[in-house]
Amino acid sequence: MHDRDGEALGKKVAFAKTELMPWFDELSRRNPFPNASEQIDLVVGVWSPVWSTIPFQDIFPGRIHEQSYQIFQANGYYANMARYAPGKLPLLKQFIEKLVAYDFMILQKFEVRSEQWFIQNIGIQQGFRLNLSPLSSEKAQAWFESAVQKQLAKGEANTTPDFQKLDRSTAKKYEKIFQATAQLQHLYIDRDFRLVKTQRAAKQRPSYTIAVRKASTNLITGISN
């Protein structure tokens, strides 16, 4: 599955429809924690999204899949983040990727109401880094905790994200995403593995994410390539 996460979105969607849906249906039937209220304690921690059809993850080119994370806190804060290796010109790509990296985080809040998960996007964090060491799970968690503290200090009065540092095309895409509250459903969840279905509107195509707790990446090897 890790090898397939870098494929084009349309190809991943087709793969899900033709190959993965029987697996998803079977996992859903075997879900040991089908009630959303039982799932809250299970999600807390750092997860690696090893495969996903969520469109916004690859709005920027060059996402490093091994340095992509989902992090949940017990206080209701949640983040999707990743490191990106910019630079697409053949002569400069290798040089730039070795020196510079771009880290991007979407800060979110989650809650369970009437046995349903709801996700609200509340901010973004971003920055260029010297690409001398990877964005490890420990660094990702520290960055997330710092972002949460900044958000708590601001309070709930201002939850409008700052898109000024993004190019106009990307900013428009994220503005549209931020306007909606996503519904999230764990088709399957245990302490180390999550199969998640997300949808922002009833008429929208649902997205699927396979995530494993960062220390347990061997749990998806049974899914066919």
Language-model segments: residues:
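Soluble ligand-binding/transfer domains with enclosed cavities or grooves
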Residues: 1-225
